[in-house]
Amino acid sequence: MNLYFFTFTGNSRKIAEMVADELAVELREIKSLRLPYIAWLLLSFVPCMAVKIDVQPPTGKEIILCFPKWTFNCPPVTAFLKKFAKGREIRMIICYGGFDERRYAEFYKSFALKCGAKKADYLLVKRRELRENPEKVRDNIKKWLKIS
């Protein structure tokens, strides 16, 4: 199993670190251009837009991918799925703070399948809950991943 994350604020990294601790797996960061916030905001309005990423390629057939909910698109995540989803099971943990998170998650589930993933599912994590009750978030992740 490979564990990846993309983060702008650090929240998705915190979630990925929880998963890495529970599964005892290596954590891999999806790196991209360091653009100002306004540039990422504009890019997030363009569905399916990808950007160049720097990441260690996955070795297994199962991937856990932690990333933020942006407006319509998170370009580094889109690039990752276009490049690596084919033939793999993709489990996404999406951190959100605003609204419309379910539509966004369903879009990425569908997108992963269109990119050739054998299976795709997701877990939503509210940013506020991550800050205020990280142990509850950890418990929810463990249940979702079926870790005792």
Curated annotation (Swiss-Prot):
Superkingdom in the source lineage: Archaea
UniProt-recorded name of the protein: Uncharacterized protein AF_2332
Organism this protein belongs to: Archaeoglobus fulgidus (strain ATCC 49558 / DSM 4304 / JCM 9628 / NBRC 100126 / VC-16)
